[in-house]
Amino acid sequence: MKKDLHPEYHEATVTCASCGNTFKVGSTKENINVEVCSQCHPFYTGRQRFVEHGGRVEKFKKKYNMD
């Protein structure tokens, strides 16, 4: 392998915005934020749950000051 060609690979902390769960994975980034993880996603938990988050329309309105 060539030196100084590949990005550094280290342990990253993944943080869930919905439930606050954190876990460690290997990545080129140090911190990763996700909206839903396996601890709170309805597919994995088997129950319906409504998650409050900004959708694409809200992000667009915020970006162009259309509130």
Swiss-Prot record:
It holds the Pfam family Ribosomal_L31. One of its GO terms (cellular component) is ribonucleoprotein complex. The keyword rRNA-binding applies. One of its GO terms (molecular function) is structural constituent of ribosome. Gene3D superfamilies: Ribosomal protein L31. InterPro entries: Ribosomal_bL28/bL31-like_sf, Ribosomal_bL31, Ribosomal_bL31_A, Ribosomal_bL31_sf. Keywords: Ribonucleoprotein, Ribosomal protein, RNA-binding, rRNA-binding. GO terms for biological process: translation. Belongs to the bacterial ribosomal protein bL31 family. Type A subfamily. Part of the 50S ribosomal subunit. PANTHER family: 50S RIBOSOMAL PROTEIN L31, CHLOROPLASTIC, LARGE RIBOSOMAL SUBUNIT PROTEIN BL31C. Binds the 23S rRNA. HAMAP family: Ribosomal_bL31_1. This is Large ribosomal subunit protein bL31. It comes from Finegoldia magna (strain ATCC 29328 / DSM 20472 / WAL 2508). The gene is rpmE.
